[in-house]
Regions:
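Short beta-strand immediately N-terminal to the catalytic nucleophile in serine-hydrolase-like folds
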Residues: 90-92, 117
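Gly/Ala-rich beta-loop-alpha elbow adjacent to hydrolase catalytic centers
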Residues: 92, 96, 100
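Conserved HGGG/HGGXW glycine-rich cap/lid loop of the alpha/beta-hydrolase fold
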Residues: 6-64, 86
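Flexible "cap/lid" loop of the alpha/beta hydrolase fold
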Residues: 105-106, 110-137
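Short, hydrophobic/aromatic-rich segments at coil-to-beta transitions
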Residues: 1-2
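Conserved acidic catalytic loop of the alpha/beta-hydrolase fold
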Residues: 72-88
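Active-site signature of alpha/beta-hydrolase-fold catalytic machinery across serine-
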Residues: 38, 102-106
Length: 137
C-alpha cells in the first residue's frame, strides 16, 4: 500500500480505482480500509483513498512524547485531500465523520459532497469558547 508522510510519521493508505472525482473514505476508530470492502464494488471504478490511522497496522506508532497527538490522523487525511487535482467526495463513519467535518470546515472548496454516519460531533466543539454549544452535548 502507498504511504503519506506527516511530520515524523508515515501513514499507510488504501488506494483503488481511477475515475474522478475521488472518494475519501474515513473509517471509524479501531478499523481500517477493510471497513469499506463491501462498498468498493459499488463505486464504479472511482478513485478511492482511505488512510490507516496512527498506530494501526501498516502505519507508524506514535513517536512523540506524552499523549498521542489526535490531530495526526486529521493531517494525514488532509494531505490526501489536498493532493487530489479537484474536489472529492467524503464518506466518514464515527471518528472518520469527525475528521471529515473538520476537513469540510477547513477546506470547503475541496469537498464536492459528503456523507457521514454517526460522526462524533462533540470533537468539533473542542476549540470553541461557546459554552452553550458544549452544554448541549
Amino acid at each position: 500500500m502507498p504511504r503519506v508522510d506527516v511530520g515524523e510519521h508515515s501513514f499507510q493508505y488504501m488506494e483503488e480505482g481511477e475515475s474522478s472525482p475521488a472518494i475519501l473514505l474515513l473509517c471509524s476508530t479501531g478499523l481500517d480500509s477493510k471497513q469499506w470492502k463491501g462498498l468498493l464494488p459499488h463505486l464504479g471504478g472511482r478513485r478511492v483513498l482511505c488512510p490507516h490511522y496512527l498506530c494501526y497496522p501498516g502505519t507508524d506508532d506514535w513517536k512523540g512524547e506524552g499523549e498521542i497527538d489526535s490531530w495526526m490522523d486529521y493531517r494525514a487525511s488532509e494531505a490526501l485531500l489536498l493532493a487530489e487535482d479537484g474536489p472529492v467526495d467524503i464518506i466518514g463513519h464515527s471518528y472518520g465523520g469527525f475528521i471529515g467535518l473538520r476537513l469540510a470546515k477547513e477546506h470547503p472548496d475541496r469537498i464536492r459532497r459528503m456523507a457521514f454516519h454517526e460522526p462524533i460531533v462533540w470533537g468539533c466543539l473542542q476549540h470553541t469558547e461557546r459554552d452553550d454549544l458544549k452544554n448541549e452535548f
